[in-house]
Amino acid sequence: MEYAYSLSTYYDDELVAVMRLHDFMEAHDAWAKCVDYGNAKVYARYNLTDPTGKMYTKTFYANGEVVIK
C-alpha cells in the first residue's frame, strides 16, 4: 500500500517518529494534534509532506514561541 502523506517529528534535531498517512483527513487529524514541544529540551519540529512534495512545518519552542511555515 502506498502512502500519500508523511508526518515527521523531530525533538532538538533528532528524528523521533515518522507517520505514513493515506489520505488528507487522516493527515489533517494527525497534524492538528501537533500542539506543543513534547519531550524536547529546546524545540520540537513537525513536518507534514503532501503528495506533491510540499512541506508544511510547525516548530514549538520550550520558551512558548511557535513558528508555522
Roles of regions detected by a PLM:
Residues M1-L15:
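Short aromatic-glycine-(Arg/Gly/Cys) micro-motifs in beta-strand/loop hairpins
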Residues S8, W31-C34, L48:
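Short intrinsically disordered, low-complexity segments
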Residues D36-K69:
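Short, mixed-charge low-complexity intrinsically disordered segments
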Residues A17, L21-Y43:
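A short, charged, amphipathic alpha-helix used as a generic interaction element across diverse proteins
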Residues Y10-D12, L21, N63:
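Intrinsically disordered, low-complexity regulatory regions of eukaryotic regulatory proteins
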Residues D13-M19, M55-T57:
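Surface-exposed loop/edge segments in extracytoplasmic proteins
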